[in-house]
UniProtKB/Swiss-Prot annotation:
Keyword Glycosyltransferase: yes
Protein name: Purine nucleoside phosphorylase DeoD-type
Organism domain of life: Bacteria
Keywords of the record: Glycosyltransferase, Transferase
Keyword field contains rRNA processing: no
Catalytic activity: a purine D-ribonucleoside + phosphate = a purine nucleobase + alpha-D-ribose 1-phosphate; a purine 2'-deoxy-D-ribonucleoside + phosphate = a purine nucleobase + 2-deoxy-alpha-D-ribose 1-phosphate
Summary of the function given for this chain in its UniProt record: Catalyzes the reversible phosphorolytic breakdown of the N-glycosidic bond in the beta-(deoxy)ribonucleoside molecules, with the formation of the corresponding free purine bases and pentose-1-phosphate.
Site (Important for catalytic activity): 217
Major enzyme class: transferase
One Pfam family named in its UniProt record: PNP_UDP_1
The protein's assembly and partners: Homohexamer; trimer of homodimers.
Residues reported in the UniProt entry to bind phosphate: 20, 24, 43, 87-90
Active-site feature positions: 204 (proton donor)
Source species of the chain: Histophilus somni (strain 2336) (Haemophilus somnus)
Amino acid sequence: MTPHINAPAGAFADVVLMPGDPLRAKYIAETFLENAQEVTNVRNMLGYTGTYKGRKISVMGHGMGIPSCSIYAKELITEYGVKKIIRVGSCGAVNMDVKIRDVIIGLGACTDSKVNRIRFKDNDFAAIADFGMARAAVQAAKNKGIDVKVGNLFSADLFYTPDLEMFDVMEKYGILGVEMEAAGIYGVAAEFKAKALTICTVSDHIRTHEQTSAEERQLTFNEMIEIALESVLLEDSL
């Protein structure tokens, strides 16, 4: 047990899917996993373990922002032996080549947060996904006939940013989506010798102001979860 996770030793699988919303974790467990059992509920940050096509997998919420997700990712890795984390969440698009409802596989994550500079002696740290996990996710999407975008995300510290000109810079540099956690999770994974990947669905477009409905978000969310789960099986088979 930790100050933030009250699961017993051995409660988590070696692979954990992590949405921001703990109720999304509950939904994933109830919809996609067999024999799912709740294993932690401190602060209502729900976590579950079950099986997917016979493969033991866990799912747990990580909250909003790099500080929150970093706490849970670190404790899962160092205290529960988790080897791989797949963040599954939503993002906003700033590039006109990216459309709402697109699924993005985040190979890397830029950020305006200082967390990785703090851990990397004030130098730039290349916060990147594990190649094998990313490759398996791309293949899983192809197998299911789901088009995905692959590239860089931007993990913002502020949801309500006053610096709107930064969106122009992001677009210039080909950023596919803006979210709030990937760079932190990639940094934690690197520091503690684990592996991580972020998969996002585009829920809104910052340029066009388009937004998905609740029903549309659910559909694309399901596709993202299917990609994540199938990628675990694919990588196991390699």
